Amino acid sequence: MEDEVVRIAKKMDKMVQKKNAAGALDLLKELKNIPMTLELLQSTRIGMSVNAIRKQSTDEEVTSLAKSLIKSWKKLLDGPSTDKDSEEKKKEPAISSQNSPEAREESSSSSHVSSRKDETNARDTYVSSFPRAPSTSDSVRLKCREMLAAALRTGDDYVAIGADEEELGSQIEEAIYQEIRNTDMKYKNRVRSRISNLKDAKNPNLRKNVLCGNIPPDLFARMTAEEMASDELKEMRKNLTKEAIREHQMAKTGGTQTDLFTCGKCKKKNCTYTQVQTRSADEPMTTFVVCNECGNRWKFC
């Protein structure tokens, strides 16, 4: 069953990428006949694919069925209500029930209210794994939330994924604030570094992982620059560290003075060289050379 849901999700994702939702209705009907579970919903992330189709499609039948599916799946995420909750709901005054959003939605002839509620339900599906961020009236914090949400909108990944970038931005900011407890320079620098890394064109996977929930907001709020770096940058840092270790080894051994090498910078022959085994034992050693005149360094195998 999981393979079937994954297959449908992949097809929908391709439709969103190609901006062609032809055949989406048939896929949605297939999903409707599949008994969905919470585990299946979380492991396949089918909700994101359905929400992306819902947002892109102009076919009323497609959007209506997508909304219906998302609404039914939302109940799985919320969990079953207890008997106590049911009893309390029965005891509520009739006037309260009539004034509730649910009652107004059922009795109202306006489709605007209904569509807004469905939109909220759909967006809630993807942030329900984490508690919603508390509201704030602090202007600095509100501005930071806006900037984080804007950074999450870099590219169009959030559309295909179906993530609520505004809520995610608020959750990230809330986690930062809860750790630092004020909006001083440390707080601003933390927010600024998150924004910079989310916008990094060379590191799109970081943004996608945050939008998909692979990196939770509270973890992302605490990540170091090294942890947020792209794979390319991590590899570069690793190589630089190795190089620094080799140079340190060369400095410790002192080296051998020679006139066999000519400095490419000052053309003098007053040099010191050291040989270090940097690769496997059956390969040639690497020779590190330092010019004693100008300090120029080079190496060769």
Swiss-Prot record:
* Gene Ontology CC: one annotated term: nucleoplasm
Say yes or no: keyword GTP-binding present: no
Compartments it resides in: Nucleus
The coiled-coil segments of this chain are none
Annotated TFIIS N-terminal domain ranges read 3-80
Region (Disordered), start-end ranges: 76-139
- Which organism is this entry from? Rattus norvegicus (Rat)
SUPFAM superfamilies in UniProt = Conserved domain common to transcription factors TFIIS, elongin A, CRSP70, Elongation factor TFIIS domain 2, Zinc beta-ribbon
Locate the residues binding Zn(2+).
263, 266, 291, 294
Which parts of the sequence are TFIIS-type zinc fingers? 259-299
- State the function annotated in the UniProt record: Necessary for efficient RNA polymerase II transcription elongation past template-encoded arresting sites. The arresting sites in DNA have the property of trapping a certain fraction of elongating RNA polymerases that pass through, resulting in locked ternary complexes. Cleavage of the nascent transcript by S-II allows the resumption of elongation from the new 3'-terminus.
- PANTHER family annotated for this entry? TRANSCRIPTION ELONGATION FACTOR A PROTEIN 1 (PTHR11477:SF1), TRANSCRIPTION FACTOR S-II ZINC FINGER DOMAIN-CONTAINING PROTEIN (PTHR11477)
Which residues in this protein are found as N-acetylmethionine? 1
- Which domain of life does the protein's organism represent? Eukaryota
Cross-link type Glycyl lysine isopeptide (Lys-Gly) (interchain with G-Cter in ubiquitin), placed at 55
Q: What else is known?
A: S-II binds to RNA-polymerase II in the absence of transcription.
Name of the molecule in the record: Transcription elongation factor A protein 1
| UniProt GO molecular function | DNA binding; zinc ion binding
Report quaternary structure and partners: Interacts with EAF2. Associates with UBR5 and forms a transcription regulatory complex made of CDK9, Pol II, UBR5 and TCEA1/TFIIS. Part of TBP-based Pol II pre-initiation complex (PIC), in which Pol II core assembles with general transcription factors and other specific initiation factors including GTF2E1, GTF2E2, GTF2F1, GTF2F2, TCEA1, ERCC2, ERCC3, GTF2H2, GTF2H3, GTF2H4, GTF2H5, GTF2A1, GTF2A2, GTF2B and TBP; this large multi-subunit PIC complex mediates DNA unwinding and targets Pol II core to the transcription start site where the first phosphodiester bond forms.
